[in-house]
Structure formats: C-alpha cells, structure tokens
C-alpha cells in the first residue's frame, strides 16, 4: 500500500470504506479485484459524486498508473477521497461567497477597512484600528485599499 493509499484510508470511516467496497465489487464482475475505467463514472455517481467527463479523464489518468485500463480498490479509494475533498472545497467556497456578500455591506464587491471592523465588532471581538489596518494590508494583495473576493478567499485559506 502506497502512502497515498494509506492516507486515503485514514480519511474514511470503516463504514465508508465498506460502502465503497460494496459499490466497487458490484462492478468487479469477474472478481479479479479491479474495474474498468468505463465503469468508474457509474460507480462514483452511485456513491453520490458528480464527476464531469473531463474530471473522470483526469482522475483516470492519475489513478491508472500502469495504463492497464483498470483500477484496483486501493486506487479507487484514493480517487474517491480526492473527489470528496474537491466537492467539499467547492461547497466551502460557496459558503465563503455567502460570507463575503454579508460582509460587503454596501454591495460594491469589496470589503473596506470599515466593513472589516464591523465584522469583528459584530462578532464581539475587540480589535484596534492598527489591527484592522494590519489585516487590510495582509489581505489587500493589489494595494487598492480594499479586499475583493479573490483576496478574501486567499485570506480565509489560512483560517480553515
């Protein structure tokens, strides 16, 4: 088992591994321990994932190291964990977009120092003007005096 495969297993509960194994086995018709790449999309959709054709091609390219056209169960687990993390990242980005809209009180597409200070006051945090200034300076990568959504995402990466 590779480090990547061990890491994938550590990310999943025993229950999830069993669920993935049951789905995997349904498509392993000959019991040989692998499934064809063609069946991969069907299995992933059955497990609640929604990979696009392009994502599937990219996943298969990464997972099917020997180019055999088949994927064994350990490779399958690595792939499923990768897809789950990608889906979670998309969801958290949606949640962050919602936060950004709330923080951007005047809806101009930016968070300025005043709005940033308001966020902290509303959360009960006591921050000084110097701390706000420092946060703005750290977050405002293009130095326009305000934080746009991309800058906000970068700031929040450090928080999660």
Swiss-Prot record:
Binding site for Ca(2+) 2: 64, 66, 68, 70, 75
Record-annotated EF-hand domain positions: 15-50, 51-86, 91-126, 127-160
Residues reported to bind Ca(2+) 1: 28, 30, 34, 39
Modified residues (N-acetylthreonine): 2
Gene3D superfamilies, per database record: EF-hand (1.10.238.10)
Lineage top rank: taxon: Eukaryota
UniProt record similarity statement: Belongs to the troponin C family.
Cross-referenced PANTHER family: MYOSIN LIGHT CHAIN 1, 3, TROPONIN C2, FAST SKELETAL TYPE
Function: Troponin is the central regulatory protein of striated muscle contraction. Tn consists of three components: Tn-I which is the inhibitor of actomyosin ATPase, Tn-T which contains the binding site for tropomyosin and Tn-C. The binding of calcium to Tn-C abolishes the inhibitory action of Tn on actin filaments.
Name listed for the protein in its UniProt record: Troponin C, skeletal muscle
